[in-house]
Amino acid sequence: MDPFKVDFGSLQWQEPLPGLRFKVHRLGGKQLRLVELTSVFVEPQWCEKGHIGVVLDGTLEIDFRGRLVSYPEGTGIFIPPGPVSGHKARSLTPVVRLVLVEDA
């Protein structure tokens, strides 16, 4: 196994909430997540974590406390951590797939 290569095919899906599943690889205080949201997913609370990533498939909508921003396929995401950038995500398409780099 190459420590600098992430084989998402060998990782198990984690499904913490209905409509949300992800595969995660952690290394050195960071994590790389392959995330899949469906239109069933409802984020239960405001997230204040930072996220950097890209939408691979579908269209993601992020609610920044009343300001809605759409992220179609191929769009990058750069959300700094903290209450000012508090957000909730949802899928505008049946499925959204994205990759996120985050603090572990």
Label for each model-derived stretch:
Residues 1-35:
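A short, N-terminal "cap"/entry segment at the start of jelly-roll beta-barrel domains
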Residues 27-47, 81-82:
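Conserved short histidine dyad/triad with adjacent acidic residue
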Residues 28, 63-67, 92:
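Short strand-coil-strand connectors
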Residues 37, 46-62:
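Short, conserved beta-strand element in jelly-roll/cupin
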Residues 65-83:
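Short acidic-glycine-tyrosine-enriched beta hairpin
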Residues 78-80, 88, 93-104:
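A short hydrophobic beta-strand segment most commonly corresponding to one strand
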